[in-house]
Amino acid sequence: MLSGEKILITGPAGRIAWHITQKLAQKNEVWGIARFGNLQERREVEALGVTTRHIDLATCEFGDLPRDFTYLLHIAASFEHGSYDRAIQVNAESAGFMLEYCRSAKAALIMSTLSVYKPTPAPWHAFKEGDALGDIMVPIPDTYSIAKICEEAVARFCARSFNLPVTIARLGAAYGPRGGLPLMHLEAMLEGRVIEPRWDPLPYSAIPGDDIADMVEPLLGAASVPATIVNFCGDEPVAAQQWIAYMAGLIGVTPKVMVKPVPGASVGSVGDVTKRLGITGPCKIKWQDGLRRVIEERHPGLIKVPFA
């Protein structure tokens, strides 16, 4: 576990960064920057011992933020839709400004996404790091995959230009008590809403927040010039239909699921984890256990089925 470091995390209160922030704040000097539109979330981050600053990544006006960080974790992302110009500014340009500002760091982790891969007609295809990139073609957020491809290009340039070791981690379907696609489906079931996956089956490489946090240190250790690019996702592919059925069984409801195809869109988001396994080792949490734990954290007492 990293200790005694000075670490900057963007978006520390978010569903992806929260577990990382909790873990790293135990033995390091951690700073967190974000817009912090939710004051309560900022207080929760500061309660971990994290020093915060209100900084909008659309402008990257850093004010009195120090520069002497030993590690940068750029995790914040914009999921706004409709404007590619805005999406590229907030996701891609901000990565460049962050890496330039922290160019003296030992290493940086840039969080990308499996959504950068060009869709294939095979739902269970496991994308490898060298596969073709392209627009995932989902309607919301419609700009995301293109903006993240741009972000990767900026990060690759910065690694070489600044001689700064960088890892670009293409994150799978991350989830935890603060959110994620499985949790969106859980809330839909609780509210009696229809869940509309775009294909059947619609597989993902889901990964829980605890595994994400545990793998940050080795991913930073793998940072290099040129940048290391690696899929950062769960070991066990699982279809949305599978986790919906599993969670429905735990909470005792009948889910409403209706497939709603999206022409041209990706029909699966599974990542090949061979490269990541060589860096981090295997995940510790099976998807069933991870989802059960998250439901218990988010809705105590909701689960009707005893742990087997």
Regions found by a protein language model. Name each.
Residues 175-179, 201-213, 229-247, 285, ...:
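Substrate-binding strand-loop-helix patch
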Residues 39, 51-93:
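NAD(P)H-binding glycine-rich loop region in Rossmannoid oxidoreductase-like domains
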Residues 2, 6-26:
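N-terminal Rossmann NAD(P)H-binding glycine-rich loop of SDR-like oxidoreductase domains
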Residues 123-124, 153-204, 209-210, 247:
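NAD(P)-dependent short-chain dehydrogenase/reductase
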Residues 191, 215-264:
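Mid/C-terminal beta-alpha module of Rossmann-like enzyme folds, strongest
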Residues 209, 239-245, 259-296, 300-307:
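Conserved C-terminal active-site "lid" loop/helix of NAD(P)H-dependent oxidoreductases
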Residues 91, 144-148:
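Active-site YXXXK catalytic motif of short-chain dehydrogenase/reductase
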Residues 96-143:
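Conserved Rossmann-fold NAD(P)-dependent oxidoreductase catalytic core, especially the SDR/UDP-sugar
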